[in-house]
Design a protein with these regions (language model features):
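Conserved GNAT acetyl-CoA-binding A-motif
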Residues: 114-126
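A short beta-loop-alpha structural element at the N-terminal edge
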Residues: 8-21
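Conserved acetyl-CoA-binding loop of GNAT-fold acetyltransferases
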Residues: 119, 138-147
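Active-site rim helix/loop that mediates acceptor-substrate recognition in acyltransferases
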Residues: 32-55, 69
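Conserved acetyl-CoA-binding loop-helix of GNAT-fold acetyltransferases
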Residues: 93, 99-112, 135, 139
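Conserved beta-strand-loop-alpha-helix junction that forms the acyl-donor binding cleft
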Residues: 123-133, 152
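Helix-loop element at the rim of GNAT/NAT acetyltransferase active sites that forms part
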Residues: 22-36, 76
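Conserved beta-strand in the GNAT
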Residues: 55, 63-72, 87, 92
Length: 157
């Protein structure tokens, strides 16, 4: 795929996109099974005021090569002082379509959607060890706010 991002069609997903969306989600989150992906997709489609997913397709090709999922959050989001916040739950572009501005175009569509819903900021997170994700976030204009390690301790029942 040699097309610049301007040629990619960016649009909000519809229920009819569920199979292609699930395939892209599998590539980003391979640890989740198809039941979990189907449940997440249904939950997002059932709450269009809170969730959105945008997909990118190259010219003349129906199958999407990338997606960005976002959610409007009203809780405390690290590094954001105001609410609501648009949160990037996940962004993925197939390797053959990367470095062409597709992720940027997907996130721009998501940001416009969040702005229309009154979001004060666009936030995201990434594992500490995922340097590629950190680089992508910086390239998309995100500023690092915190580095966090989560802990847990089981409680006896």
């Amino acid at each position: 795929l040699t097309h610049p991002a301007a040629l990619f069609k960016i649009r909000a997903v519809q229920a009819s996109d569920a199979a292609a969306w699930r395939q892209l989600r599998r590539a980003l989150w391979p640890h989740a099974d198809d039941i979990e992906h189907a449940r997440d997709i249904a939950r997002q489609l059932d709450a269009p005021a809170r969730h959105a997913c945008f997909i990118a397709s190259p010219p003349g090709i129906l199958a999407p090569v990338g997606f960005a999922e976002v959610a409007v959050r009203h809780d405390d989001v690290n590094g954001c002082g105001a609410s609501p916040v648009l949160f990037l739950e996940g962004v993925f572009v197939e390797p053959a379509a990367r470095r062409r501005g597709v992720a940027r175009a997907l996130c721009a569509a998501a940001a416009a959607w969040g702005t229309a819903r009154g979001c004060a900021a666009f936030a995201s997170d990434a594992p500490l060890e995922n340097a590629a994700s950190h680089a992508l976030h910086r390239a998309l204009g995100f500023d690092k706010t915190e580095r966090v390690v989560f802990f847990r301790k089981p409680l006896a029942r």
